[in-house]
Amino acid sequence: MLNELVFFTVILIALFTVLFAIFLYLVVRKRKDGKWKREVETYKQLYEPVLFRYLAYGDEQVPAPSSSAQHVAMMELLDHFMRVLANGGIKERATTLAEMYFVDYLRAQLAHRRLGRRMNALFFIEDFYLCSLIHELEAMYEQKQLTTMEKRQLLKMFALFQHPHVYEYMKQTDESFTQFDYRLILSRMDDHMFTKMVDHFFDWNEKIQYALIDMIGIMQKLAHVSFLRTLLRHEQSEYRIRALKALAEIAFPLDSAQLRIHLHSPVWQERLMGLRLCARIRQYELVETIKELVKDRVFSVRSQAAEALLRMPNGLAILEQIAQTSDDRYARDMALEWLERGREND
């Protein structure tokens, strides 16, 4: 019994010692982090007027940072000013200063054991457009222990820097990459690089293909409207649906005969996107077809049809007629709902 009590006491003391050590570590770490942040803020106050004058007028001598806190303070300030005072001259001066003072520091940070430090370095390299570090970025991308987060950021940077191997890198991505990831990468490409992606559309995996179609609409890339129109004839419905969505984003006016094909599609998502395009381009000759779709069996299609009618020149009158005379209860309800919305915004 005594031995068990001693053993239990030893375990309690050991646990208390471990917990106390963790507590001390956290206290010391918090104080150290607090001291670091205060130091960075102090340097920011010193650098702020100098950096502002340098970026605004280009005739100020900026003292070189010598410590880690000075580097971070100057980089954060420079990044802030680039976002607030966005114009070509300021960005060019910021990149020149970053090339002069930050390259060695950021190169060292890319090899840091902590992920947060490495990611911050990548963000700063992107923001300052430090193409001189491209070889280090290539070497980093080839590392086996690279995290998915780092790989995503590197691909965005390769696209921004117009790296010639970005196509090969994108073909090697794994399933962890989402369509949203690919959208971010595509959004950083220039027109030439984006066009090359579109030209080789069917070489890419489905996620990249869908992201490409979406970005044509989101980025209003009118040069690729003809490509979207070819997809409208594709046998795979998802291509047609996304192409219609992109055309709706651009508000590109398809002819009525073409639109009727999609409005009569057996795929409800295709009818929905066709109606979304109708709502943007307001082709009055399609009113009767759209009125029929207010009776559609799918709620979202009925709702989009009612919105498309509301956007017509006499949309309120059309919806009032449906609300009063339609033989379909769901169509009457939908017309009343959009009538109320229309009158609120009238």
Regions found by a protein language model. Name each.
Residues 1-39:
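N-terminal signal-anchor transmembrane alpha helix of single-pass membrane proteins
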Residues 1-7, 328, 336-346:
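Short, Lys/Arg-enriched, disordered terminal segments
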Residues 316-325, 332-340:
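Leucine-rich solenoid repeat scaffolds
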Residues 23-33, 142-204:
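Long, contiguous interaction/recruitment modules in multidomain scaffold/adaptor proteins
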Residues 113-114, 143-147, 174-178, 204-205, ...:
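Short inter-helical turns and helix N-cap capping residues of alpha-solenoid HEAT/ARM repeat scaffolds
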Residues 26-114, 119:
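N-terminal topogenic membrane-targeting module
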Residues 97-110, 130-142, 163-173, 191-202, ...:
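Amphipathic alpha-helical scaffolding segments comprising HEAT/armadillo-like alpha-solenoid repeats
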Residues 80, 87-97, 119-128, 150-161, ...:
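Structural detector for internal amphipathic alpha-helices that build alpha-solenoid repeat scaffolds
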